[in-house]
Amino acid sequence: MKLKRHLLTAALTLFCLSAANAQLLRTTVEQGEIEGVEHEGFALYKGIPYAEAPVGNLRWKAPVSKKPWKGVFKADKWGDRPPQPIDPNQNGGEQGMSEDCLYLSVETPAKSKNDKLPVFVMIHGGAFLSGSYSGTQESFVKEGIIYCSIEYRLGALGFMAHPELSKESGKNISGNYGILDQVMALKWIHDNIAAFGGDPDKITIAGESAGGISVSILCASPLVKGLFRGAISESGRSFWPVGESRNGNTAMLTSKAAEAGGLLLQKRLKAKNLKQLRKVPAMDIVKNTAFESFWPNVDGYSITDDQYKLYEKGSYNDVNVIIGTNSDEGSMFSRPVSVSDYERRIHEIYGSWADQVLSLYPAKTEEETYFAQSDIFRDGSFAWGTYAWANLQSKTGKGKVYMYYFDQDSENTIVKSRKGGASHVAEMPFIYGYKFGSGKMTETEQHMEQIMSRYWINFTKTGNPNGDSLPFWTSYQEGKPTVMIMKEGLHLGPVQNQKQMDFFEKFFKEKRK
């Protein structure tokens, strides 16, 4: 009897060891040995530091590569999220919050370092103000894709420019630290993903909202040339003209305009110089900037120029892309006002173009001002940039553009569209399985979820969303019905709201003069 128990115990032990060995739970990266944890049958590496903590004298500096560690690094806890005014409530509330925030995660189904699996790198959104890496994505991993997600500095700590910082940099640049974090994280993934069974030549970067803008910026940045083969930008683009003000979300800031914002913050914090600024507690900076917009600026280094102009002359990372917007993007950012206030605001932003705007987006009642503002925000801040991206790359590049327009009215959303349609981030449950609102989906929506997630998975694997008897998605061609309209009965159609796109094309062209 004892012998039987002994043999059974030995067999169970051997089985457990074999199961553990089936996952790549320990590997070696540039900094040393690293050990992950088992999660849903896969190997999950939480909180991998890809750079030194940007604290003390490293605050407001380009990220510094992580030094080698001694022993085995236990990647079993999420790294802290960046200081921010909103709790993103990611990863089950397991994360702390501090300036020591430059971490990434890797979830891999690989059984061996030689598997050479495709890689999906997610850049979170949140207006460059809030958010946190999303940690795990079993729906992709179970399909043989390695899923990575990254943290980067946010708000003033990630994007404040300042004349002293520009002088200190040696390159006469400042701000854009959050973008430089993304660059370093992507380089780390590219250089180390083989240790997790990934193929560095099969990396797809993706993001939504500010994450999508980040993807757009990276697609034009020389700093990441050759580090990815595909890109997905959901509701994000960076094709505005370069200007001195972001009034009405109509411009990317010049470095000088961004530096002026840093000087104003210094004055508000009553700091005499940069040395004193670096000693201000991080959360005091967050509280004093609250929901102010510290965004990327055109510094001539990570963001080299007006992105529209870069794409006109073919100066960008020419890869296949999936890009798109939702039908009611602006509903999350709009509120009803009086008709007179609406018209006054339009004149303030658009000047001599105001009458054309009011003709395209009329409002006779307070309720109609909500819908008009929502549509202006959708088109000027989201849809036009996607339209410009598709047109320019299809003319000057070899990489194919797969453009979509998401228009499904669902209960599974953060903000319910008041006019029917899809609000900001409403596409994400259909791709990544997130649960928002009621979390409920109709049978038709569940079918859509299967199709949309499969498009994203196929694209990550091959660079083409098609296959598996899916509705065929033709690459974009200007003037032809090659936009995938994503709602009940997915189908190809023309660019939506073409008159509005034509207006913003002319408006932004004039602003570039």
Language-model regions, residue ranges each:
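Short, solvent-exposed turn/loop segments enriched in Gly/Ser/Thr/Pro and often Arg
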Residues: 153-155, 206-210, 404-410, 471-478
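Substrate-gating cap/lid region and adjacent catalytic-acid/histidine neighborhood
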Residues: 243, 272-446, 455, 462
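Serine-hydrolase-like catalytic core of hydrolytic proteins
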Residues: 90-271, 301, 310-334
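Non-catalytic accessory segments of hydrolases
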Residues: 22-176, 200, 434, 439-452, ...
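Surface-exposed helix-capping loop/turn segments at secondary-structure junctions
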Residues: 108-116, 193-202, 269-275, 392-402, ...
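Bacterial Sec-dependent N-terminal signal peptides
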Residues: 1-24
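A structural signal for well-ordered alpha-helical segments within the folded catalytic domains
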Residues: 43, 99-102, 180-187, 213, ...
